[in-house]
Amino acid sequence: GFVGAGIGAALAGMRPIVEIMTVNFSLLALDQIMNNAATIPHMSGGQFAVPLVIRMATGAGRQLAAQHSHSLEGWYAHIPGLRILAPATVED
């Protein structure tokens, strides 16, 4: 999928940005996010970096109904090796 392609591009020296439409769809790529993007730097002893940005919408809004309004950023924050960024103000 897109996340796997992004991981491969990152390992090849690029700095890809992968967009996932909503955070709930990121669960389909969870294996790649958790077991590859987040762990390859640690498993390689720092020899490999995965400079990948995964951008996704989270929370209610955008008229996407209940199935697409999850807020999983707190859950992702508990995965070692991931950094979670979220705007705090309108200016952000």
Predicted regions and their residues:
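Short glycine/serine/threonine-rich phosphate/pyrophosphate-binding segments
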Residues: 1-5
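Conserved thiamine diphosphate
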Residues: 7-92
